[in-house]
């Protein structure tokens, strides 16, 4: 419908956050919103380049309604249990005077600058020097100007913007710091000044840390010692204790190198490991002293001076460190440097001397007592045992006992006989001394050997009373040897040394008849037989000239045989072993010269001729003498001719065997062809 107007939807009402029960009017609510909400910035906010360091915050709402006296006093450090109670009591008694002197000095001088304490765990190198330098600069900055720098403002704004990111443990630490500062009666202007000073310290620290710390190097340094030394910088140089002098030396050179820090740390560690008990005893006293100092500083009225510092509480890692020590038993470097206790040191030096004196006195007393005891005779508690008697020898057997008795009787008889003979020989020697000295020497030797009684076992030894025959012959006089004849001497030489031994064999049995009937052959070595036999036999024959002229070869051979048979007997023919039968007759040579001409023509007729030649050879060899046979061999050269004939005959035989009995090679070839065609 065109006449109708579209309805307007009203806006949804928005709920406003108000503290009152009834809603306000629109103008009033707009003014409240404008006042409560900050205006939006036109430009982009400044973002800090690095994360700001956590700063101590104050609780304005809590501190405003509370008085300074009503606040509870929280201790700086948790007390640590000590096991060595006796040493602590001694140290407390010895250091009471020093504590009184320190309290009097602190009450006289107003300490204006107190540096913040840090935890001793893993402090980076170069941090100690930066802390002292920052403390001095912060004091000078507070005197000259109270307005913070723009960099400090940015860091302060960034820290305020990141308040929501702070952990609860840091909040607890902040609250502890707020309690220890005791700044309830200060105005807002004074609080702003404190914040500016803290920002200056943080900025200077961050700036110097970037310059001084190279890389990620970390050195465990005892910072608590440096903090105490920084707190005592306001004291005059004429200090009583050694710690004041060392603090002045260390603060004069804030820009110390890394090498000095390392040396300082090594010295501290050596002292800690050398005397850990003294350090434990002194740490508790230092803690108490620090607590008193802090109480005095807080009790003094704080004027409107520009240079104001805040004592920071210990780090939040103290309870966690103690818990970790109890769990893991890991040693931790103490926070404060131990102070020398001169009286306790003197007492400890005196103790070993007194102990040594006591020990020496005890040693002297023991020596005197031992000397006195050595003079007094001691009665043994037990009597000494008697030695056991020697073992009784066993009784010998009956045979051994009888043998020993027999030997004793024989020795007694020998001694009795030797005594009589020695008396007779002594009288005879006195009479014959001048006559014959050789006889006396022999008799003395005989007496000496007779006294031995056969103690030495010699081969062929008889009874102990009787000397062996070899000694008797040597000791016998030369007259007795001359009296004996040659036959007796030969019999004595050939006589056996001992008796004949019986042959071992089966007893009670007879030998077999063959063995018993065998006659024993006895050889006489002294007899010699001479045998004569002929080694050579010589036969004589006629000369060549006579044989050729007188007789024919056949007759000559027959005559030679007859003469030989007559001249040589039959026994000599059998016994003569060596005969020279090498003679040849001259008629054989003529026949052998004729043989090669007839051998080729009549091969069959050759056999009877060879037999006849052999017979003639035997006849001629028997008839000729060896000298003649040798002469004939050298002159006629028949052996060479025979060898040549034998070689020719062997060659002919070999040709026949190879050709198969045919004289010519052509005939053999024709015969092979005929046999091949026939097949």
From Swiss-Prot:
Region of interest: Disordered: 1-85, 110-522, 549-580, 593-679
Phosphothreonine PTM sites in chain numbering: 18, 58, 85, 277, 552
Keyword Phosphoprotein listed: yes
Subcellular location: Cytoplasm, Cytoskeleton, Actin patch
Lineage: superkingdom: Eukaryota
Modification Phosphoserine occurs at: 36, 70, 104, 183, 206, 231, 284, 324, 576, 620, 623, 625, 627, 667, 671, 675, 678
Keywords, ordered alphabetically: Cytoplasm, Cytoskeleton, Phosphoprotein
Compositionally biased tracts (Basic and acidic residues): 9-19, 179-213, 243-272, 339-361, 372-383, 471-482, 556-576, 667-679
Cellular component GO terms held in the UniProt record: actin cortical patch
Stretch list, region Interaction with SH3 domain of ABP1: 383-396
Amino acid composition bias (Basic residues), ranges on this chain: 110-119, 501-512
Biased composition (Polar residues): 133-149, 164-178, 296-323, 414-427, 437-452, 603-614
Keyword Mitochondrion part of the UniProt annotation: no
Main localization, broad class: cytoplasm
Record's function text: Involved in mitochondrial migration along actin filaments.
Quaternary structure note: Interacts with ribosomes. Interacts with ABP1.
Family, similarity comment: Belongs to the AIM21 family.
Protein name from the UniProt record: Altered inheritance of mitochondria protein 21
Species of the source: Saccharomyces cerevisiae (strain Lalvin EC1118 / Prise de mousse) (Baker's yeast)
Gene that produces this protein: AIM21
């Amino acid at each position: 419908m065109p006449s109708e107007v579209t309805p307007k939807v009203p806006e949804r009402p928005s709920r406003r956050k108000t503290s009152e029960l009834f809603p306000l009017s629109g103008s009033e609510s707009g003014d409240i919103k404008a006042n409560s909400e900050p205006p939006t910035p036109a430009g982009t906010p400044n973002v800090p380049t690095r994360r700001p360091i956590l700063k101590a915050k104050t609780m304005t709402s809590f501190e405003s309604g509370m008085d300074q006296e009503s606040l509870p006093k929280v201790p700086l450090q948790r007390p640590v249990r000590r096991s060595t109670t006796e040493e602590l009591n001694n140290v407390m008694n010895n250091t009471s005077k020093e504590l009184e002197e320190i309290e009097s000095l602190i009450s006289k001088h107003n300490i204006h600058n107190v540096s913040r304490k840090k935890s001793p765990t893993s402090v980076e190198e170069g941090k100690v020097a930066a802390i002292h330098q920052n403390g001095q600069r912060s004091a000078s900055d507070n005197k000259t100007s109270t307005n913070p720098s723009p960099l400090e403002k940015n860091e302060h704004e960034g820290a305020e913007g990141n308040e929501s990111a702070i952990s609860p443990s840091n909040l607890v630490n902040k609250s502890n710091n707020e309690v220890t500062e005791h700044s309830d009666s200060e105005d807002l202007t004074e609080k702003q000044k404190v914040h500016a000073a803290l920002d200056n310290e943080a900025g200077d620290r961050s700036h110097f840390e970037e310059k001084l710390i190279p890389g990620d190097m970390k050195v465990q340094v005892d910072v608590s010692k440096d903090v105490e030394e920084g707190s005592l910088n306001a004291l005059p140089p004429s200090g009583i204790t050694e710690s004041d002098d060392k603090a002045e030396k260390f603060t004069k050179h804030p820009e110390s190198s890394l090498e000095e820090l390392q040396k300082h740390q090594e010295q501290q560690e050596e002292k800690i490991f050398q005397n850990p008990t003294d350090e434990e005893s002194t740490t508790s006293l230092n803690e108490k002293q620090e607590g008193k100092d802090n109480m005095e500083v807080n009790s003094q009225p704080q004027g409107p001076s520009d240079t104001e510092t805040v004592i920071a509480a210990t780090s939040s890692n103290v309870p966690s460190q103690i818990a970790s020590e109890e769990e893991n038993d890991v040693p931790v470097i103490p926070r404060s440097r131990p102070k020398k206790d001169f009286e306790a040191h003197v007492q400890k030096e005196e103790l070993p001397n007194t102990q040594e004196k006591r020990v020496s006195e005890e040693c002297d007393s023991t020596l005197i007592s031992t000397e006195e005891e050595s003079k007094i005779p001691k009665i043994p508690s037990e009597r000494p045992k008697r030695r056991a008697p020697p073992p009784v020898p066993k009784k010998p057997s009956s045979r051994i006992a009888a043998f020993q008795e027999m030997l004793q009787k024989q020795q007694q008889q020998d001694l009795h006989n030797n005594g009589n003979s020695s008396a007779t020989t002594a009288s005879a020697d006195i009479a014959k001394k001048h006559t014959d000295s050789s006889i006396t020497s022999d008799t003395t030797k005989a007496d000496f050997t007779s006294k031995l009684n056969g103690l030495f076992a010699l081969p062929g030894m008889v009874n102990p009373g009787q000397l062996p025959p070899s000694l008797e012959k040597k000791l016998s006089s030369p007259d007795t040897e001359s009296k004996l004849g040659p036959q007796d001497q030969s019999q004595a030489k050939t006589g056996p040394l001992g008796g004949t031994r019986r042959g071992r064999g089966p007893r009670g049995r007879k030998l077999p008849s063959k063995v018993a009937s065998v006659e024993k052959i006895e050889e006489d070595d002294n007899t010699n037989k001479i045998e004569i036999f002929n080694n050579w036999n010589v036969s004589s024959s006629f000369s060549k000239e006579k044989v050729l002229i007188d007789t024919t070869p056949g007759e000559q051979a027959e005559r030679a045989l007859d003469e030989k048979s007559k001249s040589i007997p039959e026994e000599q023919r059998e016994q003569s072993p060596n005969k020279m039968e090498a003679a040849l007759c001259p008629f054989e040579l003529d026949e052998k010269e004729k043989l090669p001409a007839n051998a080729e023509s009549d091969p069959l007729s050759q056999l009877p001729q060879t037999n006849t030649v052999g017979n003639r050879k035997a006849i001629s060899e028997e008839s000729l003498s060896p000298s003649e046979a040798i002469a004939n061999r050298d002159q006629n050269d028949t052996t060479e001719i025979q060898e040549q004939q034998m070689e020719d005959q062997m060659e002919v035989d070999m040709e026949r065997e190879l050709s198969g009995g045919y004289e010519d090679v052509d005939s053999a070839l024709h015969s092979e062809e005929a046999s091949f065609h026939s097949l």
